[in-house]
Structure formats: C-alpha cells, structure tokens
Amino acid sequence: MIDTEKCIGCQACVEICPFHAIDFLRDLWGEGRASVNADKCIKCGSCNRICPALNAELNAIPQTVSAAISNNHRNTGSSGGIFYEIASRFIRDGGVVYGAAFDENLKLIHQRATTYEELTPLCKSKYLHSDMDGVYSNLKNDLKSGKNIFFVGAPCQASAVKNLFANQYKSQLYIADFLCHGTGTQLVFNACIREEEKRRGGHITDFCFRAKTRKAEHSFSYTIECDGKKKTISGYDFEFPYYYSFLKYTIFNGACYSCPYAQNARVGDITLGDFWGIKHYNSSLDDRDGVSMLAVNSEKGKHLFDLAQDSCKVHSYALHIAAEHNQSYREPEPYPVKRHELIKILEKDGASALVRAMSCPDIKKNLLWARMPDIIKRIYQKMKGHI
C-alpha cells in the first residue's frame, strides 16, 4: 500500500490500480493526495511499484549542459525557446507532444498536441501543479497505436510516466523534466485570480507568467474582459500575490520541500530550464531576455537535442555553472515558516485573507527599483558594497 504522506499528486497509482481502490482527494489548500480504500485494496503492490515518490530511475549525471537561444522562437517560450524548436520538429516527424497549458477556465492541465497551434500554449511557464487526470489513458492509447511521444513535465510527473510506460514502450517514449523549484496549487492560484478580478471589475480570460512585455526576469500579463471590452494588463511579479509568494517559496505543495528529484541526476532524457546567471560567464547572453538551459541525460536525449541544434545558438558549459544559480539542480527549497502561517490564515479567515497575506508589503518601493535604469542599479549596488 502506498505511503500517502509522501504523495506528490501525480495520480499514477489511480491509473494503475486494477481494483479501483485509490481515490484522489484534495485538502483545504488544494493539495491532492492518493487515498486508499482498504475495503477494495488487496495489497497487490502495483501502486508501490510505479510511485515516483518511492521509485526514481535516474540517468547518469552529464558533465556539460548547453545554453541555447532559438533563432526564431525565443519569444514563444519563457526562456530561450528551445522547447518549441524540439517539440515542433517532433510533431513535424509525426510524433505527439504532451505538456501543461491553461484551459478556458484557467485550470492547468496536461494536454496533447499534434499541431503547431496546439503546441504554442505548452511553451510558457506555469507555476502551479498541472492536473494529470485522463492523461495516462491518452498516453497509453497513443503508445499502443505506435506513435512516438514527447512528454514534458515536472520531475515527479516525468518519473510517473517513465515508471508506467518506459519498460513496454521504451523506444517510443521521450521524456523531458524541467528544473522545478516546486509547484503551487490550483486552488491558491484561483483565489488570487478571483481577487484580481474583483479589484479590476472584470473577468480574466488568460494569464501568462514570465511575459516578455518588460525587461525583467519575472513579469506577468493577462487579458481581462470588462463591459464587453478586452484589455491586456501587465505587471511585475511582486504586483500579483501568487507570483510574489511563489518566488518566496511559500506556497508550494508540501512534498516539494523534500523532493527526491532536486539533484544533478535527472529522470528525463533531457532536462530543460532557465540558464540563470549565464551573463556572468558570457556577457552576450542576457538571462532577462530568456536563455534556455538544456542537459542531455541519455541517448534519446541526444536525439531530441539534435532536432533543434540547427535552429538555435548553442554554447556549452560545465554542469556546475548551471547548478550555481539553479537550486533545484542541488537540493529542494527549505520548508518556510510562512507557509504554515498562510495555511492557518486560509483555514481561519478564508481565501480573501489568504491573498492579502500573500501580497508584497512594499509594492511602491519595488516598483521604484524595477523601473530604475540598469546603470543606476549597478552604481547603487557598487556603492552599497563599499559602505
């Protein structure tokens, strides 16, 4: 029987249980966990064998990683655009791509893409845990029909897919994990969206993290409909409570703070992420514009990388350079006291109070700094270092 305290919410056990003895339940925070019905369970062990919290089949640690920038699709994604370059060629060759995207109700779900139009929504960053309900059945049907599959997800999700299907469909299944600090819940995200709608007096129809509308590492944009008219709103991360709290690591799912996949050895054939800090090693690469980090972890990963190399500018670096500014290449984020406080506020005072508690306490000061020219920031930081 699975250890529900370690559950990461992938729902793979729900899919594999032959006696339908496992339900997927969510708590007040919106965190999903498997729940075993003892009356139906015969202790066959199927769930234990595929659980990514208990079984992690990791690849050899690569010595080098690549910094990559797409020649034509840098703005399609949140970083350098290499995911689109790989995935679009995978589709061109008759394959199917699976990744996360918001639906029309701003629910983050894993979706299936067989066209370039379906692929585009999968490219942007989404800082919450995607729903995998129904995805495994679709994956199984595609694999059984002989299709090649490229699945991208958080390491725990990638591991679930690998544990379920890699033995039987090894040659057809290509997996990418991404450098994941942790994921928040749909419930907390929804609460922040509802408060934003109340403040603006309209209905938000789409949302984009890491919007490239400003020269900043983290900014957002969304479309809101008011009185039949649509308007695009953009801002910095600290102006949207969910984004601000995510970057403070205070709203992750509980299992994220002890994630077994936050290390150099990775579960995917390739690992994707942002190459934060690369400007310190190559001044021609500005990570605020987006620079992809890609690590090849297997022979199949090399095939994926080869699909995109002719359409990207690529630079090779030692692994430790990427790990220096990406903690998820070293260890999970520590559990913050603030998270416990936020859960208590939600339990006692409700969603509106939670969003207020998640908000940046000094937006004006942050706005002043964000809008300051880079040269002034550098002078200030240099002077501060000598005080």
Model-predicted regions and their roles:
Residues 1-5, 35-42, 146-149, 238-254:
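Immediate flanking context of iron-sulfur cluster ligation sites
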Residues 1-6, 12-35, 45-63, 265, ...:
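Iron-sulfur cluster-binding cysteine motifs and their immediate structural context
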Residues 12-34, 126, 222-241:
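Short, charged low-complexity linear segments at domain edges
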Residues 39-145, 320-334, 338, 344-357:
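Flanking helices and flexible, charged tails adjoining ferredoxin-like Fe-S electron-transfer domains
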Residues 78-81, 104, 151-161, 182-184:
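Gly/Ser/Thr-rich loops at beta-strand to alpha-helix junctions
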Residues 93-96, 197, 202-387:
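Long, compositionally biased charged/polar accessory segments in the mid-to-C-terminal portions
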Residues 162-173, 193-198:
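Short, surface-exposed basic-aromatic patches at helix termini and helix-loop junctions that form
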Residues 173-195:
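Short, flexible loop segments at boundaries between secondary-structure elements
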